[in-house]
Amino acid sequence: MRSFARADAHIHLFEGSYQGNSFTRRPGVLIDEVLCYQSLMQEYQIQAALVIGFAGESWCAENNGFLAELIPRCSWMQALAYWDLNSDRDPLEQLEEWRGQGFIGISLYVFEKLEIQGLAGIKDEVWNWLECNGWLISVNSSGGRWSLWKPILEKHPRLRLAASHLGLPSKFSRTPSRDEAFKMMSPLNELYEFPEVHVKLSGYYALTDPAHDFPHEATWPVTEVILKHFGSERLLWGSDFSPCLDFLSFPQTYELFSKMPFFNEEDREKILGGNLLRLIGGEA
């Protein structure tokens, strides 16, 4: 296999480390996630990473501020600010502030009713700003909620959207048939007609039961359906550091692609770095 630089399309960095259902919540456990990830970058030849802001829980409410402090110190990171869809802050004013801090996009979580309502309430002038400035929009959502994006993209087809974790189609304890895979992926796959929509092949541990079921064969049919619709040029590997480390070793987050028979070496090089580096203006 040829040697090439990797680029990670989905990591998190939290002050005091990730406090979800993780070993880092245990008393006395303290991890410097920045130093930890930088050591992984060196060991596994990672050139750049998209840092996905998340401030939707009390323990990480100041995550945007933490990332803003890191941006000038970490040239390898491209940070996306977490946008609370129910915030009272003027959105254009907020976007300009984030741009001044060095963010290159926004991170949206669209699951609950209020979040769906917040998405529907975004005005055209905001989408225009995001479109004209070429900002990346990382979205965590699932199922039929992906259909919410079609009317938005029809009006703003140059929005640069990246769907996280294969669009979170389901949690698989068995391998679905091809027909089942096609049906469950149809809301996301409807967005393939918009050329700036990308899909992150990330968070596989969250899609299989058990989570440590490497190489996650139960997800292969939905992965292949995504490949057939979007092509390898619009797929992005994301490790989902550091939550992934509760279930997998770091290299397992990308080694699974070498197990999937429908990816060739050229596909893997694009997915593991080339595509993201082009998106963020780095060398492919």
Which role fits each region the language model picked out?
Residues 10, 41, 67, 98, ...:
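Conserved, mostly hydrophobic/aromatic
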Residues 25-52, 57-72, 96-97:
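Alpha-helical scaffold segments that flank or form the walls of functional sites
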Residues 14-30, 172-174:
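Acidic/histidine-rich helix-loop elements
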Residues 7-11, 49-51, 78-81, 106-108, ...:
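Hydrophobic faces of well-ordered beta-strands that scaffold small-molecule active sites
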Residues 31-37, 62-66, 90-93, 146-149, ...:
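Alpha-helical scaffolding within the catalytic cores
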Residues 1-9, 22-48, 224-225, 229-236, ...:
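Mid-to-C-terminal alpha-helical segments outside catalytic/metal-binding sites
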Residues 117-236:
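Catalytic pocket-lining loop regions of alpha/beta-barrel enzymes
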Residues 58-144, 150-151, 204-206:
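Active-site gating/metal-coordination segments in enzymes
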